[in-house]
């Protein structure tokens, strides 16, 4: 809630700034190369339900680099599409807010990206419907939507 409080957390070793309520705190954390997390529902709703900082414009300026599910997990995928639709971030950069960047912030080096030798966790999305079609975990099919299963014969 303040740069001074952020400095205190930093002194204790905290390297993730969760839900900063002001732009100044987010900027301070990013200047210190810390991950800054805000809620994906904040993006979907068009702003904070508490009147605090708004996630989308901060993410567009690089001050927020992780979007978390917060209280509504479906908001993560929707937020990535909304961010891309705003025209400042392309879809890969917007998707990184809910995939590669959170993995990096948590030290999960083997996930969040599609590269040889990594886990191979993939969500296949119907972009027109903004809905998941299939999920692969560690390269293996873990879930398939009913309509996708029907198309496979």
PLM-predicted stretches and their roles:
Residues 114-153:
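C-terminal cap of metal-dependent C-N hydrolases
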Residues 9, 19, 71-72, 81, ...:
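Phenylalanine-focused residue identity feature
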Residues 1, 19-20, 39-41, 71, ...:
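Fold-independent oxyanion-binding glycine-rich loops
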Residues 32-42, 46-125:
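His/Asp/Glu-enriched, well-ordered alpha-helical/loop segment
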Residues 25, 75-76, 131:
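Short phosphate-engaging motifs
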Residues 15-16, 65, 121, 133:
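Conserved acidic residues
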Residues 1-36, 48-63:
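Histidine/acidic residue-rich metal-binding segments in metalloenzymes
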């Amino acid at each position: 809630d303040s740069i001074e409080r952020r400095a205190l957390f930093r002194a204790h070793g905290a390297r993730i700034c969760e839900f900063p309520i002001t732009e100044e705190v987010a900027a301070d954390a990013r200047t210190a190369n810390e991950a800054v997390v805000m809620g994906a529902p904040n993006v979907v709703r068009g702003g904070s339900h508490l009147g605090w900082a708004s996630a989308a414009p901060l993410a567009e300026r690089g001050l927020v680099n992780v979007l978390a599910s917060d209280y509504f997990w479906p908001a993560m995928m929707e937020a990535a599409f909304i961010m891309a639709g705003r025209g400042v971030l392309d879809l890969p950069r917007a998707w990184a807010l809910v995939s590669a960047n959170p993995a990096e912030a948590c030290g999960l080096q083997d996930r969040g990206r599609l590269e040889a030798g990594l886990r191979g966790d993939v969500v296949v999305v119907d972009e027109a419907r903004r809905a998941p079609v299939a999920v692969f975990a560690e390269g293996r099919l873990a879930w398939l939507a009913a309509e996708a299963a029907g198309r496979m014969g």
